[in-house]
Amino acid sequence: MQAKTFLLGAALAGVALAAHAEDGTIVITGTITDQTCTIEDPSPGYIKVVHLPTISKSALKNAGDVAGRTRFDIKLKDCPTTVNTLKLYFEPGPTTDYGTKDLKAYKQAWYVDAATLLKSPPSVTEAKGVQIRLMNLNGKQIPMGETEPNQHAAAFSGTMQAGQAKKSFTLHYLAGYVKKASGEVEATMLTTYVGFSVVYP
């Protein structure tokens, strides 16, 4: 910030400056495909609500303990027959804890008004001692904040839709409570969220 302020001041004073040296270059690549699917039975805004069971805080005694594992499914239909497998990429966002690779949990109850709930989670108080973890069905953590290849989210095969030259897919994952490394788990209602994108081969 100081360097930028200095350069601006020098330009206003009419001092000629040489172009600044670069330390490196970041090359960003990507691919957009026209092979798309439709999410089955979405709620407004494609919001999927996962209700974790009510558990005792004694189930989360030690750092890394996971409890209340709950499966959730994302169903896709009308996919091209050329698509063999699909998986999800969980997008980084305000709820991402880049240290633990889990989702921050907030002391706020879920309610029907999703637009209000998702407006600004950090404006509410973060829960102590506990976060929410996303996992594959084998229980292995899907690390939040990582690149898509490094999340290692499981991919699933599709099935042909009856009477149509299209496929359907059901993607299965787990969510659960996880004990943080520090702080006692407090008894409270919790809410978090994460955006996702479907990854096409």
UniProtKB/Swiss-Prot annotation:
Cited Gene3D superfamilies: Fimbrial-type adhesion domain
Domain of life of the source: Bacteria
Keywords associated with the record: Disulfide bond, Fimbrium, Signal
Pfam family, one: FimA
Subcellular localization, as worded in the UniProt entry: Fimbrium
Function: Bordetella pertussis is the causative agent of whooping cough. An essential step in the disease process is the attachment of the bacteria to the ciliated epithelium of the respiratory tract, enabling the organism to resist normal host-clearance mechanisms. It is unclear which bacterial cell surface component are responsible for adherence but the fimbriae of B.pertussis are prime candidates for being involved in this process.
Similarity comment: Belongs to the fimbrial protein family.
Protein name: Fimbrial protein FimX
Species annotation: Bordetella pertussis (strain Tohama I / ATCC BAA-589 / NCTC 13251)
Recorded name of the encoding gene: fimX
